[in-house]
Regions:
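Short beta-strand/turn micro-motifs composed of small residues
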Residues: 70, 112, 152, 205, ...
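Hydrophobic or amphipathic alpha-helical targeting/insertion segments
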Residues: 98-133
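Short beta-strand segments and strand-loop junctions that repeat across beta-rich extracellular domains
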Residues: 73-79, 117-122, 155-176, 211-212, ...
Length: 476
């Protein structure tokens, strides 16, 4: 009998099951050593008057302001009551749209591809209104250096056009000798499908990526194509953290640092994503960054109408996935909560989030989103996780007799699938919980074995691997 330790390495569904990687990494977060639990979503706000399709956190002085967009309205969270107040332009908005947000100074700017850019000045506005009579109608908005930049204009009539405001003046969109406001039409690459800002701007098109760099008068901005083959298929997949931007291309997931475009999903998750995602609903994707966990999260609808999260840890280049009932993922920040305000969530015994959590501290980053008509935060209990290995063995027939899950602050239930030939479909048996000595008795014979672990214990923190006892068996 031999003891063998199987580490929970990378999840690579695009590779054959005989690879020394995982076949399932569900409802977990990838780390350098194993996987951490993925938290469930809990309601943060009261109900808005319609379902939400984006969430954005703006900050003015020391005050965090949370905004959200619905099909026909814009909302602002009341930090004291958690009510979602309608702060739309008078009369609301007639079209069913998805919102894109940016902050320039103390002004929140929202784009919906139907109305002129909308603005809300933190500290003084009570409602959104047109940014300016000359402001464009845009699908995307970002801030590049000291300019507000709009892209894919006029409800798609100028889908390859970029326009920017005057320097340090988001209200001035007049092109002329006394203004640095201007525009650029990108002639090749297709329609603009996304944009990010910062020191430089990145313009994503169907079949290209263009870098937007400030060079001063008389041209103001220089536009350089950094990719003529790889573009972005869905703007809602574009998400930025620091100098890095992550996005979905026609053949998979990429990162871009402003100069280089790098494939991050090749031979890992690209084929899995396109096989599982509902292609007709990619426009309903959302994406965000969790800088604390160092992950990018893409939300999409799969072929069975299930909301699914695809998770990428950029520090260790590992992936996982989750199922969720959340419609939109977003980065947000807490508005802060007094002990009296906690009454809005029920009594101390019914709180699903620890009082030590950043949720209750104003201005702290929150991995958030929206579920129906409420803002939610991913600060709840651990999701029900499952981690399944690839095939182990293959040289001779063997019997797995014992398993010991390696789970920090917890244990696990174990199931096994054994088969003689690779053309047989692996079928997991029933899960058996580990006993008080963290042992699961098994007796499963085959040439190839897969072990599946469901981590248990409400406070389990890291699933590292599984130890098994294996006995060789002669073929008959």
């Amino acid at each position: 009998m031999a003891n063998q330790r199987i580490a929970f390495t990378e999840w690579t569904p695009d590779l054959a099951g005989v690879a020394e990687n995982l076949s399932v990494a569900k409802n977990v977060v990838p780390t350098a050593l194993g996987y951490n639990p993925f938290p469930t979503a809990v309601n943060y706000s009261a109900a808005a008057s319609e379902n939400l399709n984006n969430v954005f956190a703006g900050k003015f002085s020391a005050t965090t302001n949370i905004f959200a967009g619905g099909a026909t309205k814009l909302f602002k969270l009341d930090g004291a009551t958690l009510a979602m107040n309608n702060v739309s332009k008078t009369g609301n908005y007639s079209a069913i749209v998805k919102w894109n947000f940016a902050q320039f100074g103390n002004t929140i700017i929202a784009a919906n591809n139907v109305n002129k850019l909308q603005s809300y000045t933190l500290g003084s506005s009570t409602l959104f209104d047109d940014l300016n009579v000359d402001a464009p109608v845009a699908k995307y908005v970002a801030v590049v250096r000291d300019f507000v930049v709009a892209a894919n204009l006029d409800s798609g009539s100028n889908a390859n056009k970029v326009q920017w405001s005057n320097i340090n003046d988001e209200t001035n969109w007049t092109v002329g000798a006394t203004s640095q406001s201007d525009y650029q039409i990108i002639s090749d690459g297709g329609n603009i499908t996304g944009m990010t800002g910062g020191e430089i701007g990145l313009i994503f098109l169907d079949r290209a990526i263009v870098r937007m760099s400030y060079i001063g008068s008389p041209l103001f901005f220089q536009f350089d194509t950094i990719s003529r083959n790889v573009g972005c298929v869905e703007g809602n997949s574009v998400v930025q953290y620091g100098s890095m931007t992550y996005f979905l291309g026609a053949d998979g997931f990429y990162s871009c640092d402003g100069t280089n475009v790098t494939a991050i999903g090749t031979q890992k998750v690209d084929a899995w994503f396109y096989a599982n995602a509902n292609q007709s609903k990619l426009n309903l994707m959302s994406s965000t960054i969790d800088p604390i966990r160092k992950i990018v999260v893409w939300e999409f609808i799969d072929n069975f109408a299930q909301n699914t999260l695809l998770i990428y840890n950029w520090q260790v280049n590992k992936w996982s996935y989750c199922t969720t009932d959340v419609d939109v993922v977003a980065s947000s920040a807490s508005a802060g909560m007094t002990l009296e305000g906690l009454d809005l969530y029920g009594n101390m015994d019914t709180l699903t989030t620890s009082l030590d959590d950043a949720l209750w501290t104003g201005g702290k980053f929150l991995f958030a989103g929206a579920r129906d008509d409420r803002v939610v935060t991913f600060t709840g209990a651990n999701s029900d996780a499952q981690i399944t290995t690839g095939d182990i063995g293959g040289e001779t027939t063997s019997v797995v007799t014992l398993a010991r899950p390696i789970v920090d602050n917890g244990s696990g239930s174990v199931a096994i699938a054994s088969r003689m030939l690779l053309n047989a479909v692996p079928q997991l048996g029933s899960y058996t919980a580990a006993d008080s000595e963290n042992r699961v008795s098994l007796r499963s014979s085959g040439n190839y074995h897969r072990l599946s672990v469901i981590p248990t214990g409400s406070n389990w923190s890291n699933a590292i691997g599984i130890d098994i006892d294996v006995t060789p068996q002669g073929a008959r």
